[in-house]
Amino acid sequence: PDFRLNKAFDRWETLSQTEKDKVEFLCNECCWFGCMDRKACYETVSRKNLGENKEHHCAAPDSDQGYRFSKAMNNPGFISVNDIQNVYMPMGFSNFKIEGRGLGSALVLEFLLYYMTKPEYQLHVREEIYLDNMLDLF
């Protein structure tokens, strides 16, 4: 999925429901919106996941900071819980992908809390996980 198309509503409105059922939106992409090297980066990540030793050095602004969920939330392509519930689902879309399985359990927890836990329960879930030592922070 190309997250830069997330907000291309004029394109999405023309799809049939069968086509909409095949669309998957990448919600929390942190990649620089103006990146022209995304294909090479994505391929490198895929090859690393396969055990290959390929390297790709991102030249995007602030790439040295790594992934930050707060940064992703400011990305023009970011899809919030509110967007999912009030924009995309009423349009007939139901497939949403959360990036970052390999970023570490603390970040994955934040994604799951944000996207899958009601705000009033987020602190309770976070405390239970921290107090139970289930989270590998390092």
Q: Model-predicted segments: where are they?
A:
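Active-site pocket-lining/capping segments in soluble small-molecule metabolic enzymes
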Residues: 1-138
